[in-house]
Each structure stands twice: as structure tokens, then as C-alpha cells.
């Protein structure tokens, strides 16, 4: 019986900015519907890993496969068309545009065939998930609260109907209650079968969401395993404290 290919297969991935190597020999696989939390102190390489997967990091070596197809040589826009969407740190919305206009911009990756119907369906899905955005669809996005802007950034990434969602530090700068709501949304998305790769500093909530987790240190995987095994690990505490 043939073994089903993982949805995402990262093998021996290394990446550099100029002559400075940021990632070294990163390998992991994800099945469809799995969630992976990427942990580590500031500067460990979490954001770079997501940028490498999404095609935004050009100087990279190794293999990145999606459903068996090699995508490591593709441009970022081509990777979006393959079904990988990223929510970058800092939201990066079109702040002078309305909520609806931001969402429509996120739908540009949809195929032209039947695009109007796809956009309509995608809008209905994100407004069902984010009812407050539906109420504010005509509001200028720059006037939203920080939490609403982060929800809009996630909703915009979902407009392309991705199979894999990459999230880079989505809780940064948010109040505790907003972070709780944010992770509630992520758990809902996980329940739909979406595959999630989350780079996050909020370790307890990141582990609660994850099926598996990796901890980066100096660009390498220092720890990996089930969240329950990592949650009380002395090793993870030492990594965060710089030991």
C-alpha cells in the first residue's frame, strides 16, 4: 500500500541574508490538517523559515515540496497560486482602503475561471468567521483597532482559499483578551482541516494549537516533538533563557 505524501515536506532547508546564514538544515513534514508551532527566542529564525516557505526568502537551499511538487524555486506569487498563504508580522494591510477592498485584494490569487463566484464564496466564508469585519466592511482599515486589523490580515490571507496558512507572530502587540480571541479563530480554522504553520512567542497558546512543535535556536531545530512533551521541558526553558 502506497504511503500518502505529506502536504508540506521541508528537507535540509538553509537560508541566508547576504553572507549571514539564518537557517541551517531544517527538516520537517506536515500532513494535511496538521498544525505546527515554530517556537524560539527572538532571532532564532522563525520568521525566516516562514519567508523561505512562502517564497519571500530568495537565498535558500534545500527542498520544499507541497503535495509532492517541488516549489522551492517558485516565486512568492506562484506559491500563493499553489495554495500557501502567509500572514506576515506587522499586518501590512492597505490602510487607506476599506475592509472590503483589502479582502478583495487578497482574492487576486484566485484563478480567473469562475473568479467572481469564487470571490463571493470566499467573502461569505471570511465574513462568517469574522462577523465584526462584516459589520465594518465599508470602514477604512487604518481606523480599525489593532486586534481588528490582525483579524483582517488573517481574513485577507484566507481569501485565496489556501491549503496551508503561515502565520508570523500574530499575537504581537495585542491585549490578552484579543490574543485569546485570535487563538479561538485559529482553533476554528484548524477544525476546518486547514494546515497551519505558526511562528509564535506565546508558547502556551501555540502549544495548545499545535499537533507538533519545533523549537529553533540559532537557526537550527533544537527541539521537536509533541506539545505535551515540550510544555514542561527544562530544555525549552533553557533555550528561551539563552542557555
Please provide the spans of the model-predicted regions.
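Helix-to-loop junction immediately C-terminal to a conserved catalytic motif
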Residues: 54
Amino acid at each position: 500500500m502506497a504511503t500518502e505524501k505529506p502536504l508540506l515536506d521541508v528537507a535540509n532547508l538553509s537560508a541566508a541574508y547576504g553572507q549571514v546564514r539564518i537557517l541551517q538544515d531544517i527538516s520537517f513534514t506536515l500532513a494535511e490538517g496538521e498544525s505546527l508551532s515554530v517556537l524560539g527566542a527572538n532571532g532564532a529564525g522563525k520568521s525566516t523559515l516562514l519567508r523561505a516557505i512562502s517564497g519571500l526568502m530568495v537565498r535558500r537551499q534545500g527542498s520544499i515540496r507541497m503535495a509532492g511538487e517541488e516549489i522551492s524555486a517558485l516565486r512568492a506569487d506562484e506559491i500563493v497560486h499553489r495554495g500557501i498563504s502567509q500572514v506576515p508580522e506587522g499586518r501590512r494591510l492597505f490602510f487607506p482602503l476599506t475592509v472590503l477592498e483589502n479582502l478583495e485584494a487578497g482574492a487576486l490569487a484566485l484563478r480567473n475561471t469562475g473568479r467572481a463566484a469564487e470571490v463571493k464564496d470566499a467573502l461569505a466564508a471570511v465574513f462568517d468567521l469574522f462577523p465584526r469585519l462584516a459589520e465594518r466592511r465599508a470602514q477604512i482599515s487604518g481606523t480599525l483597532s489593532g486586534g481588528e486589523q490582525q483579524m483582517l490580515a488573517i481574513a485577507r490571507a484566507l481569501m485565496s482559499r489556501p491549503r496551508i496558512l503561515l502565520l508570523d507572530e500574530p499575537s504581537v502587540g495585542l491585549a490578552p483578551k484579543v490574543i485569546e480571541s485570535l487563538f479561538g479563530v485559529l482553533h476554528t480554522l484548524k477544525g476546518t482541516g486547514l494546515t497551519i504553520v505558526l511562528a509564535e512567542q506565546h508558547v502556551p497558546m501555540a502549544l495548545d494549537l499545535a499537533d507538533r512543535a519545533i523549537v529553533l535556536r540559532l537557526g537550527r531545530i533544537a527541539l521537536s516533538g509533541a506539545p505535551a512533551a515540550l510544555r514542561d521541558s527544562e530544555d525549552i526553558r533553557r533555550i528561551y533563557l539563552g542557555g
